[in-house]
């Protein structure tokens, strides 16, 4: 279904996901198309390119996951991994809000902002772990699954927390 394409990536892959959303959003606006080819993106472990110059072109729902104890957080504006007040997270959430609304000054973690159908949905997660463990953490993975199930209106018979992939990694590596 070409109307429901999603992209995700961790770390540099997260950068690629948001850059892809900006690219296809800009392409859609230049072609006078209301919709980007990328319906939704989920960025894990990378917030450095969550700048207005990138976000202004995005016409996709955005999910963000950033490790609270990320060892690279010293590069963030506030020099820490707390996304509640991080300018990077605030820019993401505010980029999906109507211009007539006041800008938020604090992100409520785990709250879905915006409208999925307008592709202005935004959510930020801040799991209490280190950057390299995000792709292997059950909570971080469940948050990502929940995001895509929500934006694509997909109801799985399995709970996002019902994961067995860790056993596969452990037993077959």
Model-derived segments and spans:
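Soluble extramembrane regions of membrane proteins in the secretory/endomembrane system
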Residues: 1-162
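Individual transmembrane alpha-helix segments
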Residues: 163-167
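Conserved small/polar residues in nucleotide/adenosyl-binding loops
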Residues: 172-173
């Amino acid at each position: 279904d070409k109307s429901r394409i999603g992209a995700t990536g961790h770390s540099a892959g997260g950068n690629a996901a948001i850059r892809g959303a900006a690219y296809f959003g800009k392409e859609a606006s230049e072609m006078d198309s209301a919709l980007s080819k990328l319906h939704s993106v989920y960025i894990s472990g990378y917030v450095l390119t969550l700048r207005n110059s990138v976000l202004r072109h995005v016409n996709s729902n955005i999910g963000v996951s950033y490790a609270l104890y990320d060892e690279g957080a010293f590069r963030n504006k506030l020099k820490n991994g707390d996304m509640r007040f991080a300018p990077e997270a605030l820019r993401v959430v505010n980029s999906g809000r109507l211009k007539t609304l006041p800008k938020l000054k604090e992100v409520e973690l785990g709250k879905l902002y915006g409208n999925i159908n307008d592709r202005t949905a935004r959510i930020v997660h801040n799991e209490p772990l280190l950057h390299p463990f995000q792709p292997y953490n059950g909570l971080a993975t469940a948050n990502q699954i929940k995001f895509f199930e929500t934006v694509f209106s997909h109801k799985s018979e399995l709970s996002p927390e019902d994961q067995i992939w860790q056993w596969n990694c452990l037993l077959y590596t």
